[in-house]
Amino acid sequence: MKYILVIFIGLSLLSCRKRLDSFLFNGSKLESYQLDNYTGEVSLELNGQFAVPDSLIHRVHFPVVIDGETVQVQGVYVGDTNHINQDTVILYCHGNKDHMDFYWCREKLYANIGGLGRYGVLMFDYPGFGLSEGTATENNMYAATSSAISWLKDRGLSNDRFVMFGFSLGSAPVCEVAGHSSDYALQPSKIILEAPFASAEIMIQDAALLSMPGSFLVDLKIDNATEIKKVNVPLLWIHGMADSFLSMSSHGQLVYDNKTGVKESVLVPGGEHETTPFVMGYQAYIERLAAFIQS
């Protein structure tokens, strides 16, 4: 009877494999981006703070080659696109949910680091999210990130003025790029990880409370805890201590501990997965980011 139960559970888990992969890439499609006019759920409620004028908001897109076909990935650049060859630019890689409208509030926050317009900020939707074409997969996410970096380099950005910021799922492309600099058009001078996950395997084991390889449940190969060992640029790690989605102790702490060289941490009591900037206080949050970028 015991062996029959094990076989039944195994077959049930295999049937969920596609669903679990989809859960980690939980994007939603749109007919159009609304940004400030979006009425759906958002990552943070800014309540009118940190406004960005229309003159600094630029819808952009860039080509990504996926399986031999060229698709278009959509992005939003906040800043003066004519000054990318002079400005320091933050490439923001968002989390696993919905699309850029959900994370637009965060891009506005980052556009106010050091004062409005001090830094350019580029955010983009991964393939399969929002209006970005293609299918949501790990490799396609990396390909889109590479194209975003090339878009910035083509406009004059250099390594010393390039900062990457990854939130949640977005920690994967940041660690990938920073750990494999020769494969990308630019190498970030600093990286920021907020609520990163250690690996797909640990994420699944945490969720399922099962001691089995994560590869049994998902196709993802993401392993930030290993990739971070290859990163030799300064790291700022931010994590809410009440994060129940990606536990600080089993995810962020492991990534941080595996990073050698210059690193800083900000651990926020009471901060949950999405709420850490709010709990910390928006102004204190962006001032801490500014201090790291300017150091």
Regions found by a protein language model. Name each.
Residues S12-V65:
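An N-terminal hydrophobic leader/cap segment in hydrolases
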Residues F62-I149:
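Membrane-embedded segments
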Residues C105-R106, N224, V233, S247-D257:
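Short alpha-helix in the alpha/beta-hydrolase fold that links the catalytic acid
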Residues G166-V174:
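Gly/Ala-rich beta-loop-alpha elbow adjacent to hydrolase catalytic centers
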Residues P173-E227, P277:
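Hydrolase active-site cap/lid region
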Residues V231-N232, L236-D243:
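Short beta-strand/loop motif that positions the catalytic acidic residue
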Residues A242-L246, H273-T275:
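Acidic catalytic loop of the alpha/beta-hydrolase fold
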Residues Q253, G261-S295:
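C-terminal catalytic histidine-bearing segment of alpha/beta-hydrolase fold enzymes
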